[in-house]
């Protein structure tokens, strides 16, 4: 039996995210701190006490006491589990109505297709997430389509990924290597790992203010 929990503990959310293949920065609490003009609410679905689904909802106030719900790169859930999806989205819609939210916008962190950058202009087969879109459409969710324009998507649809095993100095192009050397000469220090992500989030926030984003 599924249970919808609107007051999960932060520690258990972090544990759930760390072990989930859809884990991403935009569903962590630190991202809500960057989006300081939005309120935030975290919800989970449990089965047998174990978290099975999670969403960090960013909430924006609109005129007339209305709200906008946005779940960036989420919810984090097994989209192949139809019973779980139906339960979760039913509860999310009830929460939205109770909060006077006029819409729930979300963009799941699912990989539709992968291909080498050099083959980006070649024809490819069918989209891999068609069954997920079909399931969500039965819950009255509207797919915005596979737009190629950034202005028509809340988050970029395309992500350039370099596998860790391929991240060698030799794999970088000459321009990138020159840029790194120039940055090092200017005193920029490069650190790898996750221990300073909170500081990175603060830098993003300062950039947001400076650029008036």
Each language-model region and where it sits:
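A charged helix-plus-loop insertion that forms the helical arch/lid used to bind
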Residues: 119-133
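Charged, low-complexity surface patches
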Residues: 84-85, 124-125, 172
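Acyltransferase donor/substrate-recognition loop-hinge adjacent to the catalytic core
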Residues: 2-8, 129-213
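Conserved donor-binding loop and adjoining core beta-sheet/short helix segment
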Residues: 32-121
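An N-terminal domain-start capping segment
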Residues: 11-24, 51-60, 139-155
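N-terminal charged segments
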Residues: 5-48
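Soluble or luminal CAZymes and related metallo-dependent hydrolases
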Residues: 84-88, 128, 213
């Amino acid at each position: 039996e599924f249970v919808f929990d609107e007051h999960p503990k932060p520690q258990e959310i972090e544990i759930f995210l760390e072990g989930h293949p859809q884990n991403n920065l935009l569903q962590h609490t630190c991202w809500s701190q960057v989006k300081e003009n939005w309120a935030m609410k975290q919800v989970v679905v449990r089965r047998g006490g174990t978290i099975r689904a999670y969403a960090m909802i960013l909430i924006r106030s609109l005129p007339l006491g209305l709200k906008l719900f946005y779940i960036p790169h989420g919810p984090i859930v097994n989209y192949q589990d139809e019973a779980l999806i139906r339960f979760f989205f039913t509860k999310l819609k009830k929460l939205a109505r109770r909060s006077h939210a006029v819409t729930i916008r979300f963009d799941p962190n699912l990989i539709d297709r992968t291909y080498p950058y050099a083959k980006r202009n070649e024809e490819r087969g069918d989209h891999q997430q068609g069954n997920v879109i079909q399931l969500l459409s039965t819950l009255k969710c509207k797919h915005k389509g596979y737009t190629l324009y950034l202005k028509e998507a809340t988050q970029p649809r395309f992500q350039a990924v370099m596998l860790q095993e391929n991240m060698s100095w030799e794999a970088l192009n000459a321009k990138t290597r020159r840029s790194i050397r120039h940055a090092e000469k200017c005193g920029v220090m490069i650190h790898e790992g996750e221990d300073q992500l909170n500081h990175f989030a603060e830098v993003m926030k300062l950039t947001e203010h400076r650029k008036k984003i």
